[in-house]
Structures are given as structure tokens and as C-alpha cells.
């Protein structure tokens, strides 16, 4: 008997991941295709949208041809995608240049131009280099011959979905990452675009679970799909990551540690009083929002540590070594500002520090200091959320920080909240699959689909005594930014 499945496609920065999920939430097959990053100048980060499409086609073909899929039929597809990235196409739907990605920081001047008119926040969000509008202004000012040919702008997963369906849409959870969308009334703020002469280049807006068309017949034939595969809009990677982790209810939160780190807290009510570069976005769950803080160099800091000091050790060995050091790393602190910092400082120029180094410190202390420093940076975001009156009943941890029981307990102790680890972690691709399953009508609500698909494996409770000690170290950590801001600025002046 042929069984129905949905595909969840996650367009990340380093790879595209595609999973096939059945009606019980079982992952039948999973494939991943690597992506090339173009960094031609300092601060630049781009990808070729056509390479996303080619990698997706390759991945779907590989998945469909696998033994596990021999008695399965794909009924629906949805997407998760890296947010903020600017894709601009002409009136034939052809990209006019490479996509400028979320981690591209060339547009600081354009951010200041926006701030001069609107202040520090626009449409409930801080004006930062990562957002889409400053990228638009950079192209407009530096590549006017390209900008004058723009017919519509999209975000990364929207372009990929367009390649499959030949229909253009953008959904709310991603649109709110542009600075051109009002999350309160679910509409484009065209007056903002008019201020900067953006033009009428806005795509139609839809909900994350909205049906937007079918895979085109010619592409379906090429990929080995049936002729009636329904496609659903999808969500930004953080919204889909939250759905894929079961984080969909008020006071539930997500801690995701990848290259960057994210703390995401779900809210049923909009909040306008956030400060310190915390974001407020629409969730992919209807009538739900999430506040989000970002640590730019979370897993990146751990990768740097490994490549620089532990080249021959595995990550597991590094974490085991870190666990052998004392809480507080024997008085050694690390700030993970290797690529600047997003929350709470919004500072692209700040750089990392080790504070308190003595001749007694060991490799184990340095490893633990990096792990603790990453976690303190994530704690910055949690502190801001709590100051605004939003408590968390639990945090589900995914990514690199969920692969170690030591790090999970450390998160519980520093954050002072229950930490959950999932039985099976698929991340944003599972969130995309859930949106497709809900869109197809497999479940009456997203909540019932999440309940069926997502299971918790282990729970870590905070140790109050440990938390009190970490609070003392955190109070010192918190002061490092102000003490080193000018010093690192001076160093960059000399270096540059």
C-alpha cells in the first residue's frame, strides 16, 4: 500500500536539508546538499539563488529514488528558510544579482540613514545590518543600474518556492524580517518604502500554511513527483525551528545553537516595549508572535575554539574536557563577539575577549569559558524578555547545545529554567513538514500536529545553588562590553 508523505525543505546558509515525513510524524528519509557562500569583500556574504534551486532539485531526486521512498507518494511540500536575505528579480522572474544574506554587514551607512528618519526601531524591530531594507538601499545606492530593473523582491525560501510553482508570495513570519512589514496589521508599510523610493516591488502576502500552488508539471516530471503535489508557503527558519521543536504556546521558549544562537519566546500578545536589539516577529502559528534575541557567534565560537586550539579533538571531547573544569572556568570569562554582536548590543565592531587569564588556567578552563560565554550571551536575551514581564515555563534546546548533557544542565543552571531535549531533532525542516501536513488537512490544527509529531526525550531542572554562582560571574560578564568597546574600536582602526 502506498503511503502519503510531505516534504519539509529547509534552506539554510551552509546547506539545504529535505525530509520526508509520514502521517505519524516519522522521518522516512532525509537528504542534505551543501551550498556555496560568496564572500568577495570584508563584510560581504552572498549566495547564488540558482544554486539553491539546483541543490533542491538534486536533493529531491536523491530522496525520491531512495529505497525508503519506494512505496511512498509526496502529497505536499513546504519550506523553511534563512531570513532577511534580499533576492531581487526582473519582470521575467530572473535574479538580477546574487542574494545578499542575513549575515552581510556592508550596509551600516544605510542603517544610519533609516535611523535618521525613524529612530532606533522600525515596525517593532531594531534597525540592524541583517534586515532586508538596508540591503535594498545599498543596492539602490551602489548598483542603480540593477535596482532600476527590479520587478519584485523576495526572501530566500520565497524564490525557491517560486522556482517550484512559478507563483510569487511572501508569508508573514518572514516578511516581518524586512523592516517593511507591520506585524500588527499584517500589511506592508508602503509609506516606509516610499520614503526611500523603493517602488512597487512588494510580493503578495499569505499565511504560513497557505496553499500557493502546485509543483509545475514539467518540474514534477523531472523530479519524479506526481502531478498534483501541493505547495504551502512555509516560514522563516526561526519560526519553523520553533514549530519543529514544539514551541508554539505562550511562555514556551526555544534555545537554538547553530552558527549563530537564538533565544525565542512565544507570545500571544504583541509587545512594543522591548529594547536592546530584541526582535518581535510573527510566528508561523496563526495569531501568535515571538520575541527573539540573537548571539551572532554561538556555534561559530566553538568552531573557532576547535580549529584554533583543539584541531585533533572532536566536539564531544572538547565538551567533556570543559566539563572537567569548575563552574566559572576557574575565574576565566569569554565574550563570544567574534563577529560583532546582535543582542543586546547591536554592535558590528565589537570583538571578543578572554578576561581573567592567569598562568594557572588550562585548556579545560578555556574550553569551559567559551561554552559558558556563549550561554551568558544567550542569557542576555532571556534577561531582556523577563524585564519586559515575559516569563518562561520551559525552554526547548536544539542544535549544538542539545548534543551534550553537560551543556544542557549548564543552560538550565544559568537560565534558571527547565530545559527540554527532544527525542528526535529535525529542526526547521520538521516545522516546514508540519505546515505542509496541516495545510493538506492531515490535522485540524497545528497544535494537534505538533502533539503527534514532537516528543520530549529528557528534562533538565536548574540547580539553585549553581545558578546563584553563575549570576555572580554573569554580573562581571555583563560589564565586559562597556569596558572593551572603545579598546576593540581602537584595535580595528589600527588593523584596518
UniProtKB/Swiss-Prot annotation:
Q: Which CDD domains match?
A: ASKHA_NBD_FGGY_EcXK-like
Any matching Pfam family:
FGGY_N
Q: Which reaction does it catalyse?
A: D-xylulose + ATP = D-xylulose 5-phosphate + ADP + H(+)
Provide a Gene Ontology MF annotation, just one.
Answer: D-xylulokinase activity
Q: Does the keyword Zinc apply?
A: no
Q: Which residues bind substrate?
A: 83-84
**Domain of life according to the entry:** Bacteria
EC number of this enzyme: 2.7.1.17
Q: Where is this site: Important for activity?
A: 10
What does the record give as the active site? 237 (proton acceptor)
Q: Which UniProt keywords apply?
A: ATP-binding, Carbohydrate metabolism, Kinase, Nucleotide-binding, Transferase, Xylose metabolism
Is Nucleotide-binding included in the keywords of this UniProt record? yes
- Which processes are annotated in GO (biological process)? D-xylose metabolic process; xylulose catabolic process
User: What is the recorded function of this protein according to its Swiss-Prot or TrEMBL entry?
Assistant: Catalyzes the phosphorylation of D-xylulose to D-xylulose 5-phosphate.
In which family does this protein belong, per the annotation?
Belongs to the FGGY kinase family.
Q: This chain belongs to which protein, by name?
A: Xylulose kinase
Source species, please? Answer: Staphylococcus epidermidis (strain ATCC 35984 / DSM 28319 / BCRC 17069 / CCUG 31568 / BM 3577 / RP62A)
Q: Which gene encodes it?
A: xylB
Amino acid at each position: 500500500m502506498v503511503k502519503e508523505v510531505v516534504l519539509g525543505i529547509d534552506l539554510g546558509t551552509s546547506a539545504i536539508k529535505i525530509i520526508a515525513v509520514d502521517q505519524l510524524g516519522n522521518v522516512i528519509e532525509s537528504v542534505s546538499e551543501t551550498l556555496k557562500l560568496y564572500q568577495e569583500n570584508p563584510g560581504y556574504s552572498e549566495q547564488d539563488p540558482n544554486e539553491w534551486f539546483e541543490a533542491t532539485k538534486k536533493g529531491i531526486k536523491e530522496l525520491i529514488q531512495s529505497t525508503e521512498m519506494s512505496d511512498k507518494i509526496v502529497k505536499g511540500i513546504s519550506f523553511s528558510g534563512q531570513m532577511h536575505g534580499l533576492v531581487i528579480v526582473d519582470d521575467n522572474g530572473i535574479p538580477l544579482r546574487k542574494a545578499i544574506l542575513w549575515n552581510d554587514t556592508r550596509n551600516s551607512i544605510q542603517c544610519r540613514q533609516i535611523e535618521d528618519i525613524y529612530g532606533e526601531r522600525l515596525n517593532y524591530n531594531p534597525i540592524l545590518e541583517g534586515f532586508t531594507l538596508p540591503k535594498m538601499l545599498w543596492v539602490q545606492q551602489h548598483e542603480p543600474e540593477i535596482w532600476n530593473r527590479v520587478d519584485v523582491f523576495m526572501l530566500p525560501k520565497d524564490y525557491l518556492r517560486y522556482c517550484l510553482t512559478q507563483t510569487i508570495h511572501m508569508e508573514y513570519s518572514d516578511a516581518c524580517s524586512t523592516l517593511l512589514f507591520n506585524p500588527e496589521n499584517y500589511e506592508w508599510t508602503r509609506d516606509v518604502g516610499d520614503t526611500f523610493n523603493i517602488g512597487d516591488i512588494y510580493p503578495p502576502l499569505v499565511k504560513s500554511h497557505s496553499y500557493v500552488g502546485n509543483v509545475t508539471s514539467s518540474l514534477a516530471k523531472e523530479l519524479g513527483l506526481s502531478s498534483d503535489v501541493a505547495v504551502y508557503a512555509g516560514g522563516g527558519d526561526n519560526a519553523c525551528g520553533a514549530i519543529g521543536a514544539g514551541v508554539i504556546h505562550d511562555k514556551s521558549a526555544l534555545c537554538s545553537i547553530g552558527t549563530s544562537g537564538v533565544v525565542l519566546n512565544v507570545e500571544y500578545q504583541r509587545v512594543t516595549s522591548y529594547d536592546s536589539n530584541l526582535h518581535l516577529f510573527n510566528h508561523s502559528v496563526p495569531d501568535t508572535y515571538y520575541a527573539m534575541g540573537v548571539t551572532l557567534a554561538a556555534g561559530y565560537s566553538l568552531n573557532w575554539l576547535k580549529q584554533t586550539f583543539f584541531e585533533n579533538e572532536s566536539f564531544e571531547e572538547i565538551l567533556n574536557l570543559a566539563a572537567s573544569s569548575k563552574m566559572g572556568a576557574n575565574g576565566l570569562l569569554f565574550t563570544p563577539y567574534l563577529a560583532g554582536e546582535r543582542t543586546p548590543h547591536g554592535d558590528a565592531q565589537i570583538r571578543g575577549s578572554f578576561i581573567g587569564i592567569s598562568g594557572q588556567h588550562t585548556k579545560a578552563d578555556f574550553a569551559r569559558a567559551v561554552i559558558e560565554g556563549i550561554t551568558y550571551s544567550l542569557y542576555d536575551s532571556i534577561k531582556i524578555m523577563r524585564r519586559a514581564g515575559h516569563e518562561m515555563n520551559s525552554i526547548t534546546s536544539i542544535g549544538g547545545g542539545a548534543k551534550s548533557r553537560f551543556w544542557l544542565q549548564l543552560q538550565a543552571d544559568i537560565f534558571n529554567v527547565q530545559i527540554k531535549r527532544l527525542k528526535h531533532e529535525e529542526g526547521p525542516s520538521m516545522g516546514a513538514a508540519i505546515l505542509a501536513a496541516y495545510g493538506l488537512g492531515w490535522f485540524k490544527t497545528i497544535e494537534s500536529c505538533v502533539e503527534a509529531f514532537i516528543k520530549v526525550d529528557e528534562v533538565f531542572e536548574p540547580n539553585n545553588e549553581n545558578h546563584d554562582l553563575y549570576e555572580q560571574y554573569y554580573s562581571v560578564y555583563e560589564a565586559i562590553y562597556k569596558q572593551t568597546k572603545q579598546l576593540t574600536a581602537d584595535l580595528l582602526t589600527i588593523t584596518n
